[in-house]
Regions:
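Predominantly extracellular/luminal regions of secreted and cell-surface proteins
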Residues: 95-113, 486
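Flexible glycine-/small-residue-rich
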Residues: 101-103, 362, 441, 481-483, ...
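CBM-like, beta-strand-rich accessory domains located in the C-terminal region of large
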Residues: 108-123, 127, 215-221, 225-235, ...
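Extended Gly/Ser/Thr-rich low-complexity repeat segments
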Residues: 111-115, 453-455, 576
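Surface-exposed, gly/pro-biased binding rims or lids
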Residues: 235, 239, 563-598
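N-terminal accessory interaction module
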Residues: 331-347
């Protein structure tokens, strides 16, 4: 049944026998133009030529030439293939085929997929999984009897696949390779080597496990190039200008029959720059980082998890694409940047070529280290609803809400509660690569009290401007208050008592002292308020002040002049500072801001205002 034709050449046959022993049979023959079948499961081998041996209870047939007409894909060259019956004395013993096949990939795959092998079908693939050429080597071992079940066929096959092209291994993805290695045994099937996937270079393997555990599923594991082109190829839509440079990533793709391929990509981001311009963060290409992306590939990919760290940032979220596979939302449940940003962030797509919109709901931002506006480029709208916006040590806005744009820098309007107290409103504008702030309130006294400056202040309107100054987290401030009233204030009482102004003391204890105008200039740093010039004037009193307030310890070191009866005394103020009359008392306030030490120089009252400088130290200086 296994030989249907051919010619025998140079046949030799010998039998040796000795008394009491089984005869020893040996033979050698050559054959040509043969049509034969090595295996019942395989197609007929045609135009076969080779040599056969029978020796030492083994039969060996080796092909010098011959072709197999595969079920699909054309002819396969089988030259070099051999067949061995391992022990002719055992009926139904094992036979072994050593394969040497060359042909189209489709033809080779169809031979590996004949019943009962079904190696390719077991992998959930078609024999037309790829175009190209291939060479197969390896062995098959099986019992020589009819009806052998597949689990009794042992195989270990290797193949080299050349000029490979496939859109089947990974559905709808163009996979190409100049050379791939195939390995198959009873445990599973693997195809590995360098490839391009839709033009993206990768080096990896496709693995299929046989048996119930691997039925209908396989896996691709690869090391691949990572750049903006990679993201574009896989339709992973990130905000514009997110990725620059190029590096490597490890990717795993799980292929399950009837489902979109699921993937996981990880990278140390070496050589890759990553930026979120909308919140002022950037990782340089030479900086270390970490990226994890998990989701599924399909007409509209999904990114269920995106974790990013590096350059002081850690973020975790997901990406949602719209029906056109463009960015709808990038939702991050938590984003941390250094010690200045800790909040959830949503980035909203606004169409091709448009900067994303930003929604920050909850969390905290510390403007002392913020880099909003530092990029100075085009940016989309930003809406913030923060638990706290920290401006400097001891000064923050809670329940902060604002809407901003990034066009040319960070700018917009906001509302909030100063240190959880009085309501303020304001504007932010880009300045010197940072943010300038203007704050206004209809409760100047409440603002002064909430800031810890004057606990008993009430009424009045406030207009405060903070301009970025040299040094991180430093601002030059200018404040204007109109209509302020100060009630029970121990420090003020101590000053008035020291200069024996009984009427003003009674006024302080009653309805409070009125100050029509309060003006100040100062430098705000992360650790200090440096008051360079301040004045408060009202009908009964004028005050000038300068010095330093240390924020962390709440210690003060101020000096100034207090001028009673300012309505009359202030007539000569053009010769002095604002808030000082012709007659005034030099004073110093030192120690705790809550309960400072008060000292007054009574002799200064007899010194004309223009010469009063002899009783005071120089005004604190600030660098430009």
């Amino acid at each position: 049944d296994n030989v249907t034709g051919g010619r025998l050449l140079d046949t030799t046959f010998s039998v040796r026998a000795a008394a009491g022993t089984a005869p020893i049979v040996a033979a050698r023959y050559e054959f040509a133009d043969a049509s034969l079948r090595f295996l019942r499961i395989m197609p007929l081998l045609e135009r076969a030529a080779g040599v056969g041996f029978l020796q030492d209870h083994q039969m060996i047939v080796s092909l010098d030439r011959g072709v197999v007409s595969a079920p699909q894909g054309g002819l396969v060259n089988a030259a070099g293939t051999s067949f061995v019956i391992l022990d002719t004395r055992i009926k139904g013993g094992d036979g072994q085929v050593s394969l040497a096949l060359d042909g189209s990939i489709t033809a080779l795959m169809s031979l590996l997929d004949v019943e009962p092998l079904r190696l390719i079908s077991k992998a959930g693939q078609s024999v037309t999984l790829a175009d190209g050429r291939g060479s197969v080597s390896g062995s098959l071992q099986f019992p020589l009897r009819k009806g052998v079940p597949p689990n009794q066929i042992k195989f270990d096959v290797a193949a080299t696949l050349r000029d490979v092209r496939s859109q089947t291994l990974i559905k709808d993805r163009d996979l190409r390779a100049s050379r791939l290695a195939l390995a198959a045994d009873n445990a599973g099937l693997q195809i590995s080597g360098p490839v391009t996937l839709d033009g993206i270079a990768a080096n990896g393997s496709w693995n299929q496990q046989f048996g119930a555990a691997g039925r209908g599923r396989s896996q691709v594991v690869a090391d691949m190039a990572l750049s903006q082109a990679t993201l574009d190829t896989f339709k992973i839509a990130l905000p514009p200008n997110t990725v620059s440079g190029a590096g490597r990533a490890d990717i795993t793709i799980d292929l399950v029959r009837g489902q979109a391929p699921a993937f996981k990509l990880t990278s140390a981001l070496r050589g890759i720059g990553v930026a979120i311009p909308a919140i002022g963060w950037r990782k340089a290409q030479n900086a270390q980082g970490a990226l994890t992306v998990e989701g599924s590939l399909g007409p509209i990919p999904r990114v269920d998890l995106l974790e990013l760290s590096g350059g002081g940032l850690s973020a975790k979220g997901e990406i949602i694409l719209n029906d056109q596979a463009a960015l709808d939302q990038a939702r991050f449940s938590q984003v941390r940047i250094g010690n200045w940003f800790n909040a959830p962030v949503i980035l909203r797509g606004r169409g091709k070529g448009q900067p994303v919109g930003v929604l920050i709901g909850g969390g905290t931002i510390d403007l002392r280290g913020a880099s909003f506006g530092a990029n100075g480029g085009e940016a989309g709208p930003m809406s913030l609803s923060l638990d706290r916006l920290q401006i400097t040590e001891g000064i923050s806005l809670t329940d902060f809400s604002g809407d901003f744009t990034g066009r040319g820098g960070f700018a917009g309007e906001f509302t909030g509660l100063l240190n959880g107290g009085p309501a303020v409103r304001g504007t932010v504008a880009p300045q010197r690569g940072r943010s300038a702030i203007r704050v206004r309130s209809d409760d100047a006294g409440g603002v002064a009290a909430a800031a810890g400056l004057i606990k008993s202040a009430t009424s009045g309107t406030l207009d405060l401007t903070l301009m970025p100054a040299s040094g991180a987290g430093s601002f030059d401030g200018d404040v204007t208050i109109r209509g302020l009233r100060i009630g029970d204030a121990p420090t003020m009482a101590a000053l008035l008592d020291a200069i024996s102004v009984a009427g003003l003391l009674r006024q302080l204890d009653g309805q409070g002292l009125a100050f029509d105008e309060v003006d100040a200039k100062f430098r705000l740093t992360p650790s200090q308020v440096i008051l360079t010039q301040a004045s408060a004037v009202g009908p009964g009193l004028g005050i000038s002040l300068d010095g330093i307030y240390t924020l962390a310890s709440k210690q003060i070191d101020f000096q100034g002049v207090i001028s009673p009866l300012y309505l009359l005394n202030g007539i000569g103020s053009f010769l002095t500072r604002k808030g000082e009359g012709l007659i005034g008392f030099n004073f110093n306030l030192t120690g705790s801001a809550a309960s400072p030490s008060v000292s007054v120089n009574p002799l200064s009252a007899f010194t004309p205002g223009m010469f009063r400088e002899i009783f005071r130290r120089p005004v604190p200086e600030v660098t430009e």
